[in-house]
């Protein structure tokens, strides 16, 4: 089921990219939904086979450190004089334009490409650990403490991301490891807030709108690709 769901998300991404037009010559291979599908699928398979949270954290660390080293030290063979953190010289961009060519978002790179999916798997695993933390039942571990725990983890990841940015900048297009940490910081802080307000304090009179969006996020994302709303 994990693999099927992952490839379904990739297929939906191809639909958003114009698959139904049957113009395959320059159809973009990667997409936001393909990135989500690949990262979630790989993350879920890792999560299913690596059960202890410390081991999962170690996997995340290896993914982020490995990608950070590769993206900052390895220079594209076709542009040896370029900086490793530019589109021309970055190894992730080189792999995308070499393997996918005109099927990339732009001629020289794709922001949701192959190698940059590696740190995105780390993003997916961090989300899975957050879900495990919320579901964890332990004596004395109240909802309030869970929210505080997520806040603390978020602050720590934010500091790590900031310090990491001195080595590799916070860059969404490259999905840099520092970007992963900073985004995880914001996400955990927001999750802690909504978890505390909705699940702990039970203030739910206002949340229907957000529940609808959250339960139909993929459909909402795809809708503007088929219907023009005039803005």
What positions do the PLM features span?
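Alpha-helical transmembrane segments and their immediate juxtamembrane cytosolic regions
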Residues: 1-231
């Amino acid at each position: 089921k994990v693999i099927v769901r992952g490839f379904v998300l990739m297929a939906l991404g191809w639909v958003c990219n114009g698959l139904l037009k049957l113009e395959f010559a320059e159809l973009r291979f990667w997409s936001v939904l393909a990135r989500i599908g690949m990262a979630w699928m790989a993350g879920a398979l890792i999560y299913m086979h690596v059960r202890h949270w410390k081991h999962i954290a170690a996997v995340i660390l290896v993914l982020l450190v490995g990608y950070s080293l590769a993206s900052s030290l390895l220079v594209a063979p076709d542009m040896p004089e370029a900086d490793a953190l530019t589109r021309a010289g970055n190894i992730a961009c080189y792999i995308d334009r070499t393997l996918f060519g005109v099927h990339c978002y732009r001629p020289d790179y794709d922001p949701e490409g192959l190698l940059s999916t590696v740190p995105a798997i780390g993003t997916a695993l961090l989300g899975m650990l957050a879900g495990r933390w919320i579901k964890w039942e332990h004596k004395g571990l109240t909802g309030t403490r869970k929210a505080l725990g997520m806040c603390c983890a978020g602050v720590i990841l934010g500091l790590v991301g900031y310090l990491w940015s001195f080595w590799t900048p916070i860059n969404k297009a490259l999905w840099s490891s520092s970007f992963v940490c900073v985004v995880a910081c914001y996400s955990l802080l927001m999750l802690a807030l909504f978890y505390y307000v909705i699940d702990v304090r039970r203030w739910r009179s206002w949340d229907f709108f957000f529940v609808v969006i959250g339960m139909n996020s993929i459909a909402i994302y795809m809708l503007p690709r088929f219907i023009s709303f005039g803005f």
